[in-house]
């Protein structure tokens, strides 16, 4: 490694440790010529996953952006940050397992909504209201009705008791 102070190409590693995220290794090095110390980081050279926005722009997949959106949707809900991080991990794993390097925001959003629906319906509705960009209250109401109908026990829907889909 070339010394940033004197340009000499010989050094020795004084200390190595893994980062908190376990995605890089931090190395303290000492130049063999000037004896000054400097830090280097070693990271895996990952192939970026691109997200195709609705307007056609392409951006690198940003897990922090996804997590931030989920945290907003789950604010004041009984969902741990660990569960949300796992949800983002699953989404990233899905992207990595795929041969395709580009995914639309629509596909990623639908995947996240489906997972969020299983986790917490209120958070799902919050996320969907931003993601789906409902044009009016009726669209929002339809989504709620579909959610309520799908959550209702099958026996209540068949018998037509109060609150079921057959009462409409």
UniProtKB/Swiss-Prot annotation:
Keyword Zinc-finger set for record: yes
Needed cofactors: Zn(2+)
GO process annotations (BP): negative regulation of DNA-templated transcription
InterPro entries, alphabetized: ATP-cone_dom (IPR005144), NrdR-like_N (IPR055173), RNR_NrdR-like (IPR003796)
Cofactor binding comment, as recorded: Binds 1 zinc ion.
Zinc finger (unnamed): 3-34
Record key words, sorted: ATP-binding, DNA-binding, Metal-binding, Nucleotide-binding, Repressor, Transcription, Transcription regulation, Zinc, Zinc-finger
PROSITE patterns registered for this protein in UniProt: ATP_CONE
Database matches in Pfam families: ATP-cone, Zn_ribbon_NrdR
Domain ATP-cone: from-to ranges: 49-139
Keyword field contains Transcription: yes
GO MF terms, alphabetically ordered: ATP binding; DNA binding; zinc ion binding
Domain of life: Bacteria
Function in brief: Negatively regulates transcription of bacterial ribonucleotide reductase nrd genes and operons by binding to NrdR-boxes.
Family membership noted in the UniProt record: Belongs to the NrdR family.
Designated name of the protein: Transcriptional repressor NrdR
């Amino acid at each position: 490694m070339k010394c940033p102070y004197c340009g000499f190409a010989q050094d020795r590693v004084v200390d190595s440790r893994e980062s908190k995220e376990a995605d890089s290794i931090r190395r303290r090095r000492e130049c063999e010529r000037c004896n000054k110390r400097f830090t280097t980081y070693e990271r895996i050279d990952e192939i970026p996953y691109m997200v195709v926005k609705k307007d056609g722009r392409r951006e690198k997949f940003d897990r922090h952006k996804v997590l931030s959106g989920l945290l907003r949707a789950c604010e004041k809900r009984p969902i741990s940050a660990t569960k949300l991080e796992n949800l983002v991990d699953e989404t990233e794993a899905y992207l990595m397992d795929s041969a395709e390097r580009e995914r639309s925001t629509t596909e990623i959003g639908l995947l996240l909504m489906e997972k969020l629906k299983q986790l917490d319906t209120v958070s799902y509705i919050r996320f969907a209201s931003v993601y789906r960009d409902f044009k009016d209250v009726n669209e929002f109401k339809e989504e709620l009705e579909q959610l309520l109908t799908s959550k209702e026990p099958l026996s209540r829907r068949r018998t037509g008791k109060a609150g079921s889909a057959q009462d409409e």
